[in-house]
């Protein structure tokens, strides 16, 4: 069966592809790919907005994404302000 998979090619699962991409982004950031800050944060905020807006009516300013670095520790903070359910 492995020979058949080798000849026909085996498609990677979406989750494993996403995991590999995230690992590449994180590795590049740790090495210091850009001195100012992570360039993926605006894209991450935009994608979070797209996903959350499928379920809840929110404004683009209701999502805040922040990355903080302290010595050998990185903290990714995501704040999402959800609308009051009583309205």
Swiss-Prot record:
InterPro entries: MinE, MinE_sf. Keywords: Cell cycle, Cell division. It holds the Pfam family MinE. GO terms for biological process: cell division; regulation of division septum assembly. The keyword Protein biosynthesis does not apply. The keyword Cell division applies. Belongs to the MinE family. HAMAP family: MinE (MF_00262). This is Cell division topological specificity factor. The lineage of its organism: Bacteria, Pseudomonadati, Pseudomonadota, Betaproteobacteria, Burkholderiales. The gene is minE.
């Amino acid at each position: 069966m492995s020979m058949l998979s080798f000849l026909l090619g085996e498609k990677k699962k979406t989750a494993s592809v996403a995991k590999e991409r995230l690992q590449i982004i994180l590795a590049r950031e740790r090495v210091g790919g850009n001195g100012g800050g992570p360039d993926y944060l605006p894209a991450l905020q935009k994608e979070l907005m797209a996903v959350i807006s499928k379920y809840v009516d929110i404004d683009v300013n209701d999502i805040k994404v922040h990355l903080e670095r302290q010595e050998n520790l990185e903290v990714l903070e995501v704040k999402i302000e959800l609308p009051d359910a009583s309205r």
